Amino acid sequence: MARDKQSALIVAAFVLLCSGCLCGVADGAKGGRKTKGPVIGIDLGTTYSCVGVYRNGHVDIVANDQGNRITPSWVAFTDDERLVGEAAKNQAALNPDRTIFDIKRLIGRRFDDEEVQRDVKYLPYKVVDKGGKPYVEVRVKAGEVKVFSPEEISAMILAKMKETAESYLGQRVTDAVVTVPAYFNDAQRQATKDAGTIAGLNVPRIINEPTAAAIAYGLDRKGAGEMTNVLVYDLGGGTFDVSVLSLDHGVFEVLATSGDTHLGGEDFDRRVMDHFIRLVKRQHGRDIGGDGRALGKLRRECERAKRALSRQHQVRVEIEALFVGVDFSETLTRAKFEELNMDLFKKTLGPVRKAIADAKLKKSDIDEIVLVGGSTRIPKVQELLKEMFDGKEPTKGINPDEAVAYGAAVQGSIISGEGGAETKDILLLDVTPLTLGIETAGGVMTKLIPRNTRIPVKKSQVFTTYEDHQTTVSIKVFEGERSLTKDCRELGRFDLSGIAPAPRGVPQIEVTFEVDENGILHVTASDKAAGRSKSITITNDKGRLSQEEIDRMVREAEEFAEEDRRVRERVDARNRLENYVYRMRSAVRDGGMAGKIGDDDRERMESALTEALEWLEDNDGGARTAEKEDYEEKLKEVEQVCGPIIKQVYKKSGDASAGAGDDDDVNEL
């Protein structure tokens, strides 16, 4: 742009016209339309989502149609149907390029974002650039290829949670409080609200996940007399947040927040996946990094292994037909899992220290540590946190998977007025996670709202022109803590035109930042002399959905329907054969029965079992994959060898117990 027509601003004599903060509000409905009926609470997670409803004086976490209280944040398409939740996740191995997950890591981001590009390498589905935003390209029913925005996919998950709540309540639901990571920026927050609209929901309030969890923790102790400093450590599937709050007679005041919107259980899974990808390449000379089907199988087993290692010290990772002709089977120990992820575990401690320092507290001032998110079940995470706080044990009183939805449901009850005496005195005072400002001359980040400022907040500052006779100024809005805008994240920009020509430094341009209770930023610039002004809601103007796009997506969302899952008889038949073979092998080699089998019979069984396992390896992948009937026939063959021998052993054992046997091994034990 020409410097004589449009240029940066300079601060005019450092005049700060209005720097006061507006206090938080107890009633989250003040910023939105009046609600009718229940306002549900939805925790829209990276890997799992959860919904809560407040009624009869308490919160109910609602189970889905599979009986589970958390629902996988997965969506899939087949030629005949769309699947959401467990049904989508369960068929992922067979349908990897049409199964979508981790969409929360794409929402509100630019396609060229470094983290988006890093994620895309691990995703089996296709992510394309549309208008600078990451869109998902997928083949839907009848072979039609469509592209979906992250908001649309998120809306499908929100709609599933909405339907779950409606089935439980027996009535239509139109309003929901939806949670987001505390470190989500404006674009991500607005995109989440747009997803709610597409799902047929009014979202009167966006609430930060750690704050919602603090409500779940603090509700039962609302009557406690003393003030309590609480640190919420929220490590989920894809994001990490830390918030320090003070709880005092129902007042939940966030003192500071910190975190990483790209750190969580998915990253731990990927470290394990990378480990096994290297192992497969070393053992079989094949790189499966670009094989979507193999990665899908590996991803599922790595997640299962991670969960198991929170309860046990080692787990067997077994994958049938990882690729053609190869079944994968390796042991993963807790020690190896911790070694692969130790730097990520330790990375979470930095934001903890930062949040405590920003709250102007010391470690010893923290009264309670509340763990939220499924990844906090990892023993090493708990151990590192305990060490950091000199042996202080985290609170175990709340369910880490459900606490966020619980708190969101409480906030929903406040908005709807259904909370009653239990919630009427609750006051939420949240903060901005990052500093907000504009670019001034020389690329300087001029800060208007510092991080951890209580919201809602409104601040104004007067700037002036940089060039003589400048008639247009460009307002560039950034968030971040660095002194130069090149090191911060641009949120949006707009131009204020029609400024009367004058020497530099004469015009007075007042810029006002206002952050609402949802953490969404609104910016206004006005020429004080001419009375001309312009304003925008900052939601990453380069990638924000237009109202027309949202309306179209709402219509398309209404066309999809929930359908049935695919049955996998062949896998069941294979598993029956494999389970029988390993059970018989255990009987031959271990336990009290092994000594009661004669040498000839043992040799016959070992031979049949070994042959069956070799047959499984040879007929389980590619063109040689066996069918259901083949597995059943092989099982009959093995049973014909092993069955009579085992029956004879049981018969002898029965005779021996009657005193009639002469088994040499009776007294071995």
Curated annotation (Swiss-Prot):
**Where is motif Prevents secretion from ER found?**
666-669
- Pfam families linked: HSP70
Disulfide bond among the record's keywords? no
Domain of life assignment: Eukaryota
Gene3D superfamilies in UniProt = 1.20.1270.10, 3.30.420.40, Actin, Chain A, domain 4, Substrate Binding Domain Of DNAk, Chain A, domain 1
Keywords, sorted A to Z: ATP-binding, Chaperone, Endoplasmic reticulum, Nucleotide-binding, Signal, Stress response
Molecular function as annotated in GO: ATP binding; ATP hydrolysis activity; ATP-dependent protein folding chaperone; heat shock protein binding; protein folding chaperone
Q: What is its main location?
A: endoplasmic reticulum
Q: What is this protein called?
A: Heat shock 70 kDa protein BIP2
Could you tell me the gene encoding this protein?
BIP2
